[in-house]
């Protein structure tokens, strides 16, 4: 027997960066970047955060730069 899917329509996620009119994603803005990494230190995917592809690429570059500069950890401490 085929099972029926439950639940209604999911609300579309809003791009936080576009909604707040952030033009430049600075690698030194650690508070902004922490919104887009998990508690383990991994970069969250677009389907979780709702960012556009363009802003996701900018975020990824900024997070990686912040990691190299020592502002963000590569992995979280246990």
Swiss-Prot record:
Keywords, alphabetical: Ribonucleoprotein, Ribosomal protein, RNA-binding, rRNA-binding
Cleavable signal peptide: none
Family statement: Belongs to the bacterial ribosomal protein bS18 family.
Chain segments annotated as coiled-coil in the UniProt record: none
Main function: Binds as a heterodimer with protein bS6 to the central domain of the 16S rRNA, where it helps stabilize the platform of the 30S subunit.
Superkingdom of the organism of origin: Bacteria
Gene that specifies this protein: rpsR
Stored Pfam families: Ribosomal_S18 (PF01084)
Subunit: Part of the 30S ribosomal subunit. Forms a tight heterodimer with protein bS6.
PROSITE patterns attached to this UniProt entry: RIBOSOMAL_S18
One GO BP annotation of this record: translation
GO MF annotation, one: small ribosomal subunit rRNA binding
Protein name: Small ribosomal subunit protein bS18
GO cellular component: cytosolic small ribosomal subunit
């Amino acid at each position: 027997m085929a099972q029926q899917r439950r639940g209604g329509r999911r609300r579309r996620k809003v791009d936080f960066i576009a909604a707040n009119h952030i033009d430049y994603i600075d690698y030194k803005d650690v508070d902004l970047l922490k919104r887009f990494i998990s508690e383990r230190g991994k970069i969250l995917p677009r389907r979780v955060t709702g960012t556009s592809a363009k802003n996701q690429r900018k975020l990824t570059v900024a997070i990686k730069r912040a990691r190299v500069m020592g502002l963000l950890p590569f992995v979280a401490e246990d």
